[in-house]
Amino acid sequence: MTLTIVVGLGRSGLGAARLLHHQGQKVVVLERGTGPDQTSCAATLQAEGIQVELGIPLEINSFEPWRSDLDAVVVGPGIPWDHPTLNGLRQEGVQIRGEIELAWEALNDIPWVGITGTNGKTTVTHLLSHVLGHAGIVAPMGGNMGVSAADMALKIRRGETPKPDWLVMELSSYQIEAGPNLAPSIGIWTTLTPDHLERHGTLEAYRAIKHSLLQRSSLAIFNGDDADLSAHRPSLKRGMWVKAAPPCHDDPPADFWIDDAGTVQAREGGAMFPAKVLAMPGAHNRQNLLLVTAAAAQIGLNAEQIAQGLESFPGVPHRLENLGSTSSADVFNDSKATNYDAAAVGLQAMAGPVVVLAGGQTKRGNATGWLAELKSKACAVVLFGAGAEELDALIRQSNYQGQVHRCTDLSAAVAIAVRATSELQASSLLLSPACASFDQYQDFEARGDHFRDLMQPHMHVG
């Protein structure tokens, strides 16, 4: 029997190993770590009949004991698709596969909505899944957040969850790169700004990966308010376009937009419902509303069903999540803002003046827009984590006139921010890191959860 090796015991690796085992394939999992978490995961898989080897680095020699039977190696999105070891295995004729492609093969009898973009994809994923579910369509979400695609496939194929009508999948550039055959029924592209350049090298390479998903989608939906997508519209696949503002005379046509009276309009069908049915703040959420409306309409929902779903949406954890108020300011958790552009968009939605907590593991990118929003809205910035010194220098060079504080971690940052909010009579206190979380946290969710816990003693009750 041929063998598939799964690399890594992360969320994707666990799902992939279990799915392959369920399909009757011989599987071995290789994991470089040897800590308590890895040991616990390994014991669980071994009890299920899956072989796990710990302390095995991703090197070509690590595969030697299984070379005679090795047919394929499966990797999750955390491993670069062009890793030298993977390239070496390719040259030897070994298939290199992404976890997302295993899930696609197992679930391509169900229509997919594939949602990608630098920012906005998590909100659109949550919102579309909710709107469809509210209308009685079984449309679970997963992929780049929540349940891994392979784990979702396993639960469906085992009959542990009902077979969905649709799958609403958030797809990162890493997953798209590793899923060249993934072809959703509907593809949605929310935004494109420089991100993950440490991995992809250039903006052009990053854009091409995102574009490939939309090219393979039966229907493509684009955000016409995004500067990069709009500039590249002539080269993009024909599809549907949404714009939050009414199209001007010289603008390319839009399929959905919001008119001057605040009503969502459809090119085919006319007035639908007031945009204010979605309570989430910010111009970017009007774009998200339109992308979801376009997809839901294609799936078969009418205007009333879409409006009811939007109106009942509770929001997305860690994305401008309103935690309540201190005695003087509204508190928002925007831990999902892991780059400058996402952080700038969050700031735009805030009532100023704002005390901002920022920091973590910095990324390559253009900080100009973020710095402009800080200068416009923020009365104080509290920096924490590994990137605090770098961000401090960036902010001071921008001639920012507000207070700048620097500390080691989020706990210290919250104490400073709460004090500054009171002293400066700020209207809002916002965690908006503009950085990845991996310097001090497992992921942005853990960072946001910690912020929520740290803020709890300071929140106003009653």
UniProtKB/Swiss-Prot annotation:
Pathway: Cell wall biogenesis; peptidoglycan biosynthesis. ATP binds at G117, T118, N119, G120, K121, T122, T123. The keyword ATP-binding applies. The keyword ATP-binding applies. Keywords: ATP-binding, Cell cycle, Cell division, Cell shape, Cell wall biogenesis/degradation, Cytoplasm, Ligase, Nucleotide-binding, Peptidoglycan synthesis. Its EC number is 6.3.2.9. One of its GO terms (cellular component) is cytoplasm. It catalyses: UDP-N-acetyl-alpha-D-muramoyl-L-alanine + D-glutamate + ATP = UDP-N-acetyl-alpha-D-muramoyl-L-alanyl-D-glutamate + ADP + phosphate + H(+). One of its GO terms (biological process) is regulation of cell shape. GO terms for molecular function: ATP binding; UDP-N-acetylmuramoylalanine-D-glutamate ligase activity. It is found in: Cytoplasm. It holds the Pfam family Mur_ligase_C. InterPro entries: Mur-like_cat_sf (IPR036565), Mur_ligase_C (IPR004101), Mur_ligase_C_dom_sf (IPR036615), Mur_ligase_cen (IPR013221), MurD (IPR005762). It is an enzyme of class 6 (ligase). Cell wall formation. Catalyzes the addition of glutamate to the nucleotide precursor UDP-N-acetylmuramoyl-L-alanine (UMA). Belongs to the MurCDEF family. HAMAP family: MurD. PANTHER family: UDP-N-ACETYLMURAMOYLALANINE--D-GLUTAMATE LIGASE (PTHR43692:SF1). This is UDP-N-acetylmuramoylalanine--D-glutamate ligase. It comes from Synechococcus sp. (strain CC9902).
